């Protein structure tokens, strides 16, 4: 069972606005135990068991750059962008967080980036003070924190390589493959579909490209038969081998 399915099953429908409320600890404990079949989701579930659910509307701010870093968040559903606004108005998106990802890790007292809901998001908000206080005596939690931190570091390293050395086609190809790996669905014809919750501008700001270059590259890949674009939010990966060559 995925983290999204496990957590959503325990949260009643709520209005699309930012708020949080506590959930009885026994229900969170049951939720955390219920995902043993999916070991990849286990670290996020261990951390989520200590938090409270929160819902953020599309394009709302979860926390701002330089705010006091009180919480770590686990994504249950939706997509979150981690971004930085430069002094001249340019924006760099550092990461897109999907269900099962955690964000808000800081070594200092304040957040160095902003976090915003790309779509309506269901999150679990966990106090940093609670995590650090319990990690010293809870080996499972300590291992979960290590695993989630390492996953974030790995994504950051891959993003650095993408920005520093790859061409526009390679960047877009790598981006689509990463989304397919993390959230894609494959049909009976073995075609993987990726849903783009983010806008073309979001993608451009993540890949360090212009929106025009992103659009041209997607069109080129479609003309080559590598992908299909049934709509602006749907991408079908028809030739993953070709994309993998771009990603190598």
Curated annotation (Swiss-Prot):
GO terms for biological process: nitrogen fixation. Pfam families: cNMP_binding, HTH_Crp_2. Residues 166-241 form the HTH crp-type domain. PROSITE patterns: HTH_CRP_1, HTH_CRP_2. One of its GO terms (cellular component) is cytosol. One of its GO terms (molecular function) is DNA-binding transcription factor activity. The keyword DNA-binding applies. Induction: Oxygen is involved in the regulation of fixK expression. FixLJ strongly controls the transcription of fixK. Residues 200-219 bind DNA. Keywords: DNA-binding, Nitrogen fixation, Transcription, Transcription regulation. InterPro entries: cNMP-bd_dom, cNMP-bd_dom_sf, Env_Response_Regulators, HTH_CRP, RmlC-like_jellyroll, Tscrpt_reg_HTH_Crp-type_CS, WH-like_DNA-bd_sf, WH_DNA-bd_sf. FixK is a protein that regulates nitrogen fixation genes both positively and negatively. FixK is a positive regulator of NifA expression. FixK may bind DNA at the FNR consensus binding site. This is Nitrogen fixation regulation protein FixK.
């Amino acid at each position: 069972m995925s983290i999204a399915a496990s957590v959503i099953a325990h949260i009643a429908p709520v209005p699309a606005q930012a708020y949080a409320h506590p959930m009885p600890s026994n229900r969170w404990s049951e939720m955390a135990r219920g995902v043993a079949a999916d070991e990849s989701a286990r670290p996020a579930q261990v951390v989520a068991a200590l938090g409270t659910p929160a819902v953020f509307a599309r394009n709302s701010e979860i926390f701002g750059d330089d705010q006091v870093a009180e919480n770590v968040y686990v994504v249950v559903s939706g997509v979150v962008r981690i971004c930085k606004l430069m002094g001249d108005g340019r924006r760099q998106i550092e990461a897109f967080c999907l269900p099962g990802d955690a964000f808000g890790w800081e070594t200092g007292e304040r957040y160095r980036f902003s976090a915003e809901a790309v779509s309506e998001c269901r999150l679990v908000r966990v106090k940093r003070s609670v995590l650090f206080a319990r990690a010293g005596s809870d080996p499972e939690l300590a291992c979960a924190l290590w695993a989630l931190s390492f996953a974030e570091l790995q994504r950051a390293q891959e993003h650095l390589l993408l920005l520093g050395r790859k061409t526009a086609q390679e960047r877009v190809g790598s981006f689509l493959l990463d989304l397919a790996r993390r959230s894609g669905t494959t049909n009976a014809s073995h075609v993987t579909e990726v849903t783009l919750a983010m806008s073309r501008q979001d993608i451009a700001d993540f890949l360090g490209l212009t929106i025009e270059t992103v659009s041209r590259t997607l069109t080129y890949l479609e003309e080559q038969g590598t992908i299909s674009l049934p709509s602006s939010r749907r991408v079908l990966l028809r030739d993953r081998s070709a994309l993998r060559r771009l990603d190598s």
